Each structure stands twice: as C-alpha cells, then as structure tokens.
C-alpha cells in the first residue's frame, strides 16, 4: 500500500510518500510545496495544484493529513484551515480516502511522546525509513503522518506493530517509549 502524508501550511506544505508492506516501511519521496508571496487565492491554488501533481505522479492508495489546531491567533488558524482545505481538495480530486490525525497523535505514534520536538520527529523518521539524510521538518512531519496512518494512528499499537522494523535498526519499545 502506498500512503501520502501531508503537513499543511499556507507558506510551506510538506508531503511524504511511503510504501507499506506488512510492518516494512519504504521511503518513496518527500518534499515541500512552497507558495508564492501572492494573494490568498493564488497560494491556495498552488497548494491544490501541488498536491494534485503529487497524487498523479506517485499514485498513492490513501492519504493522511494533520488536523488543524486552534491557535492563539484566530487569523492564523483560519489561514491554516484554508491551506488544509486546499490540500484535502487535491487529495479528494485524486480519488483518495483521507484520514486525519492531530499533532499529538502523530508525535505519539512516531516518537512515542506527544510533546516531541521537531528534531526528535526528524530523527525518528530518518531511523524508521532508513534515510541517508535527515528531511526538513515539514517533509519529516508529512512522512511521519504517513507512518502514523500506516499503523492506525494509535501509539501503543503503532510502537508494538513497529517492533520488527525497530529491532532491525537497533531500537525497541519499553513501557510505551522508544529506547535505543
């Protein structure tokens, strides 16, 4: 199964594609969609077009996207929601089912700790996908979203289900935490 993860943002939207076979995770591609400094409609159109192109080029079977959180600044929350909507439209237009996970669920599923830092996310995604270099934070979050979806988004079942892949990388789960 091929999964596309999306980390939505108005200026930068991260994407990550992985293949999943049993408990094996394989990196396909990742990157970011950067929007021009332009009016809102142009930026949203860029996100929609970018996501649509990724869906066409990489033919994922499913997609996962981060849920919007309510920010201190309501304007920022509204703009993020619109960027997320443009990305979801691109996914749905490509015929994909879309799952949604909170940032807390994402971090718990990938790192084992819901308050994990961006650096911890990047390190764990790099290990789980056996990458030669560390992806940028937006791409890492998107890859993490795909990993989270691949294992149902549940912390304990995700970490337990990843045990074979983690063991190959010299890691294991202990009391719901990842140890090296």
From Swiss-Prot:
A molecular function (GO) term: crossover junction DNA endonuclease activity
GO biological process: DNA recombination; DNA repair
Annotated Mg(2+) 1 binding sites: 7, 138
Enzyme Commission numbers on file: 3.1.21.10
Keyword Metal-binding: yes
Needed cofactors: Mg(2+)
Cofactor note: Binds 2 Mg(2+) ion per subunit.
UniProt-annotated location(s): Cytoplasm
Subunit organization: Homodimer which binds Holliday junction (HJ) DNA. The HJ becomes 2-fold symmetrical on binding to RuvC with unstacked arms; it has a different conformation from HJ DNA in complex with RuvA. In the full resolvosome a probable DNA-RuvA(4)-RuvB(12)-RuvC(2) complex forms which resolves the HJ.
Function as written in the Swiss-Prot or TrEMBL entry: The RuvA-RuvB-RuvC complex processes Holliday junction (HJ) DNA during genetic recombination and DNA repair. Endonuclease that resolves HJ intermediates. Cleaves cruciform DNA by making single-stranded nicks across the HJ at symmetrical positions within the homologous arms, yielding a 5'-phosphate and a 3'-hydroxyl group; requires a central core of homology in the junction. The consensus cleavage sequence is 5'-(A/T)TT(C/G)-3'. Cleavage occurs on the 3'-side of the TT dinucleotide at the point of strand exchange.
Protein name (database record): Crossover junction endodeoxyribonuclease RuvC
Gene: ruvC
């Amino acid at each position: 199964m091929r999964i596309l993860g999306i980390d939505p943002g108005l200026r930068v939207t991260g994407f990550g594609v992985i293949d999943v076979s049993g408990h094996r995770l394989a990196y396909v591609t990742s990157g970011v969609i950067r929007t021009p400094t332009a009016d809102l409609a142009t930026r949203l159109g860029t996100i929609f077009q970018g996501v649509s192109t990724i869906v066409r080029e990489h033919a994922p079977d499913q997609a996962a996207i981060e849920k919007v959180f309510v920010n201190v600044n309501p304007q920022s929350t509204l703009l993020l929601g619109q960027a997320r909507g443009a990305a979801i439209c691109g996914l749905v237009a490509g015929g994909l089912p879309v799952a949604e996970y909170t940032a807390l669920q994402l971090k718990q599923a990938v790192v084992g700790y819901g308050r994990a830092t961006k650096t911890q996310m990047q390190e764990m995604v790099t290990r789980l996908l056996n990458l030669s270099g560390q992806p940028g934070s937006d791409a890492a979050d998107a890859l993490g979203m795909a990993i989270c979806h691949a294992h149902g988004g549940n912390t304990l079942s995700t970490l337990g289900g990843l045990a074979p892949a983690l063991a190959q990388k010299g890691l294991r789960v202990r009391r719901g935490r990842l140890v090296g």
